């Protein structure tokens, strides 16, 4: 083999190695586009992973069930929107042996039925006799945990005639936004953290039967291969956690006010270097 050919083969090998390394430096993260907290959390994490850890990040917007299926099969490397132990309890039970739980990125999360403070109803039980709601609950995407629990609540509270209207996170808040200034009664499926609590005066309907469960955590879940494939990312996800609903709310409100999620994340990361340092410290 002459020198020129040897150099050519060597160059090809270096290119192949570089390509392999580049491929190994990419991670995919699934999120639910209609969930304000999912969008905010995922984009901030992606910005840190890209800028501080040097990985390319591929974000994939999917439904909740597909999100869990993706991380369980390894088609997704991580998800940061796992509501546990109740909301995504069924998904966890089905997939817990196929994934790695890196712990909560948000504590004191809560789901349930939400109404404006101006309505008389204070409990889910009140919906049975309050005709002002016109036997309708405005929901989000079908198959999400809060929708499954709301279907159960309709049965458990004997809300005969009530219909759960599937929509999206944006569709739900749009209907709420139309009803609120008219002081109309409206019940929606909702959760904390969410920007709508900063925009309107709202309240959770009491849930004496405990259908929606108590406070939850939103966890970061990784595929079985993530720690081997991207150890720095796995280490980051173990430390990544919002301190309060106001902290994540800063990002959610920026997005709601018109900022693109990527830009809102960049702005937040640039504004809070001390928090990023806590998450990425070795």
PLM region spans:
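Gram-negative bacterial Sec-dependent N-terminal signal peptides
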Residues: 1-23
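A ligand-binding cleft/hinge motif common to bilobed small-molecule-binding domains
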Residues: 80-95, 178-203
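Ligand-binding cleft/hinge of the Venus flytrap
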Residues: 45-54, 131-164, 270
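A conserved helix-loop-strand patch within extracytoplasmic ligand-binding domains
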Residues: 96-143
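A bilobed periplasmic-binding-protein/Venus flytrap-type ligand-binding module shared by bacterial periplasmic
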Residues: 110-120, 216-230
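C-terminal functional modules
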Residues: 244-282
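Short helix-initiation/N-cap motifs at beta->coil->alpha
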Residues: 35-36, 58-70, 164-175
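Extracytoplasmic "Venus flytrap"
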Residues: 26-43, 64
């Amino acid at each position: 083999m002459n020198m020129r050919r040897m150099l050519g083969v060597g160059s090809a090998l270096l290119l192949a190695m570089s390509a392999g390394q580049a491929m190994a430096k990419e991670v995919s993260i699934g999120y639910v586009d209609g969930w304000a907290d999912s969008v905010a959390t995922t984009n901030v994490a992606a910005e840190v992973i890209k800028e501080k850890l040097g990985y390319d990040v591929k974000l994939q917007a999917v439904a909740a069930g597909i999100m869990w299926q993706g991380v369980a099969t390894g088609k997704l490397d991580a998800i940061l929107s796992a509501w546990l132990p109740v909301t995504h309890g069924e998904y966890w039970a089905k997939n817990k042996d196929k994934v790695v739980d890196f712990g909560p990125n948000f504590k004191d999360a809560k789901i349930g039925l939400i109404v404006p403070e101006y309505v008389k109803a204070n409990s889910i039980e009140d919906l049975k006799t309050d005709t002002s709601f016109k036997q309708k609950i405005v929901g989000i995407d079908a198959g999400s945990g809060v929708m499954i629990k709301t279907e159960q609540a309709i049965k458990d509270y004997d809300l005969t005639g009530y219909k759960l209207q599937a929509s999206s996170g944006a569709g739900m808040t749009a209907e709420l936004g139309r009803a609120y200034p008219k002081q109309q009664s409206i019940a929606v499926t909702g959760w904390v953290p969410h920007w709508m609590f900063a925009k309107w005066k709202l309240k959770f309907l009491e849930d004496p039967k405990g259908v929606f469960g108590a406070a939850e955590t939103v966890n970061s879940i990784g595929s079985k291969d993530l720690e081997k494939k991207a150890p720095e990312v796995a280490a980051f996800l173990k430390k990544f956690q919002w301190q309060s609903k106001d902290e994540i709310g800063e990002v959610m409100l920026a997005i709601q006010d018109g900022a693109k999620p990527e830009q809102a994340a960049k702005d937040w990361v640039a504004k809070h270097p001390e928090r990023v340092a806590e998450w990425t410290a070795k």
